[in-house]
Amino acid sequence: MSSTSEATVIHMDGAAGKTPATAVPPPPPPAPTAPVQQQRKAGGVPFLLRSGAEGFRRCMALLDLLLRVAAMGPTLAAAISTGTSDETLSVFTHYFQFRARFDDFSAFTFFMVANAVAAGYLLMSLPFSAFGVIRPKATSVRLLLLICDTIMVVLVTAAASAAAAIVYVAHEGNRRANWVPICMQFHGFCKRTSGAVVASFLAVLIFILLVFLGACAIRRRHTTTKH
């Protein structure tokens, strides 16, 4: 009986002397590599403020989009102002009337159509320009817009130059050809057509900026790919 009790005591003492097993801590996660760190760092920065070629191309694409929206105003205003420039002048009675109509001059007709076409093109090019903001590496879209913008520069410049010549004759006349100025009688007609010509030349300047931006974006993309 005593031996059994002694064995039991020895067994309890051995169990009390043991320490509980501690859990082994998991190994630390591997440190992220440099590209991963850069990606995480760029993820918290707005895409327009990111450094590097991609952020620069996005800024240029956004500027291109804003310029297209800005160019729609002058072209549309020039087309509407020319189309509504007709004026009637009554002399003595309503039976003797003189009219100044824009479609009496082929230059004004061409001018109105060219500005309307340019405004429609700018409206249709907005989705392509917005796609360039989302995908700044899409060189094919930039090249297509560059070609179309160049065509619009030529078209609007030719139309504005032709209309400017007619407006000058309407204001100053031509003594050698015995053409008298008509703006002294048709104030509204000359005012509308003159404003339309100024707006059209403003649109030409914006188109030139668009061509310059498109060429710079394509050239920078080509240089980055080459290196």
UniProtKB/Swiss-Prot annotation:
- The stretches that face the Extracellular side, renumbered to this chain, are 81-107, 171-197
Q: Which UniProt keywords apply?
A: Cell membrane, Cell wall biogenesis/degradation, Membrane, Transmembrane, Transmembrane helix
* Name of the protein: Casparian strip membrane protein 2
Q: TM segments? A: 60-80, 108-128, 150-170, 198-218
Described by its record, this protein's role is as follows:
Regulates membrane-cell wall junctions and localized cell wall deposition. Required for establishment of the Casparian strip membrane domain (CSD) and the subsequent formation of Casparian strips, a cell wall modification of the root endodermis that determines an apoplastic barrier between the intraorganismal apoplasm and the extraorganismal apoplasm and prevents lateral diffusion.
Q: What's the source species' lineage?
A: Eukaryota, Viridiplantae, Streptophyta, Embryophyta, Tracheophyta
Its topology with respect to the membrane? Multi-pass membrane protein
Q: Name one Pfam family in it.
A: CASP_dom
Name the GO terms of the biological process aspect: cell wall modification; cell-cell junction assembly
Is DNA-binding tagged as a keyword?
no
Cytoplasmic side residue ranges read 1-59, 129-149, 219-227
State the organism of origin.
Brachypodium distachyon
**What family classification does the UniProt entry report for this protein?**
Belongs to the Casparian strip membrane proteins (CASP) family.
